[in-house]
Amino acid sequence: MALSLSQTRPPSLSHSHTLSVIVPKRTFVSIRCGPRDNRGPLLKGRILSTEAIQSIQSLKRAHRTGVSLSLTLRPLRRLIKSDLISVLRELLRQDYCTLAVHVLSTLRTEYPPLDLVLYADIVNALTRNKEFDEIDRLIGEIDGIDQRSDDKALAKLIRAVVGAERRESVVRVYTLMRESGWGSESWEADEYVAEVLSKGLLRLGEPDLASQVSLKSSILKP
């Protein structure tokens, strides 16, 4: 008996049929790391170095968990001055004023004398957050005002303290200026600084001191 095997051949594809390949669509989800509020994420690159970002995260973690901030001093001291200033400004941007003051104390120890603009920025942030007692404490910690201080920075600090309406702190700033020789031949009174200070003292109920400031400024005028 003859056995015939029949093989089933697959139907051939004619040239008239076209194969269509379905490629799955890729979707991209934008993920942004940072605080879940409108303050924006930490800025990395030219503004904040990796070391600065890590320091900020460490400070905020210590603040959140109640760990003593003194434990963060050693890592902070390893940062260069520009990184410390960047950390301070970023903390102020996020309204972590207590942490910013902590960083300022490190700057004051490691890189004296400090730019008075940093003090002014912290005073403005404390005013914004209504932490007025902290302003008095901050100004009270200033040991002296260097004669090399920039007049614009000094004026900015005075404006900030006057804006917070801290009379005693304004008087202290003036006292420190006077003790450092402001208004003398060694440190000539800048006209704009004198005007800002005089108006501020007058506004805060210190007319005698305001007149004193105006007199110091006018004496040295040619």
Swiss-Prot record:
UniProt keyword annotation of Thylakoid present: yes
Family, as annotated: Belongs to the PPR family. P subfamily.
Gene3D superfamilies, per database record: Tetratricopeptide repeat domain (1.25.40.10)
Its membrane topology: Peripheral membrane protein
Compartments, as annotated in UniProt: Plastid, Chloroplast thylakoid membrane
Keyword check for RNA-binding: yes
Reported function: Essential protein required during embryogenesis. Mediates group II organellar RNA introns splicing (e.g. ycf3-2 and trnA). Binds weakly to specific RNA. Promotes the biogenesis of chloroplast thylakoid membranes.
GO cellular component: chloroplast; chloroplast thylakoid membrane
Domain of life of the native organism: Eukaryota
Presequence positions on this chain: 1-32
Record's protein name: Protein THYLAKOID ASSEMBLY 8, chloroplastic
GO biological process: chloroplast organization; embryo development ending in seed dormancy; Group II intron splicing; mRNA processing
PANTHER family per record: PPR CONTAINING PLANT-LIKE PROTEIN, PROTEIN THYLAKOID ASSEMBLY 8, CHLOROPLASTIC
Start and stop residues of the PPR repeats: 115-149, 150-184
Inactivation phenotype: Pigment defective embryo arrested at cotyledon stage in homozygous plants, partially rescued when grown on sucrose-containing medium. Retarded growth and greening. Reduced abundance of both the excised intron and the spliced product from ycf3-2 and trnA.
UniProt-recorded Gene Ontology molecular function terms: RNA binding; sequence-specific mRNA binding; single-stranded RNA binding
InterPro entries assigned to the protein according to its UniProt record, in alphabetical order: THA8-like, TPR-like_helical_dom_sf
Keywords: Chloroplast, Membrane, mRNA processing, mRNA splicing, Plastid, Repeat, RNA-binding, Thylakoid, Transit peptide
